[in-house]
């Protein structure tokens, strides 16, 4: 949204719009930036909880659910039926494919494959992350046994 120049940051001129289709719910204190080079679009049936940030030129598909405090950077494509739980952060210029679910407080920095569930920061497939977390719980016991 800003160009870094030697004399400081220069705000880019916006020529886009915000397009909100039918049956979209936008909760309290949401921020939706208009597009810089194209439109920011929220498609039919999508629901935004309170305090959601949608940056410029982002396209959100049909029947998506974004829980409270989700932040989406610019130029992101979120395909249909995606669920982003609370406080998920999404890096710019990526695609979240159809049917993806991202658990709360996850950080998304790359494209996510269709129909999978993700968790963590950086996020990975949720089952793998849960395995890692369960192994971390027993790690102190393993280290103690190795020291004996």
Residue ranges and their predicted role:
Residues 1-125:
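Structural signal for interior beta-strand "rungs" in well-ordered beta-sheet cores
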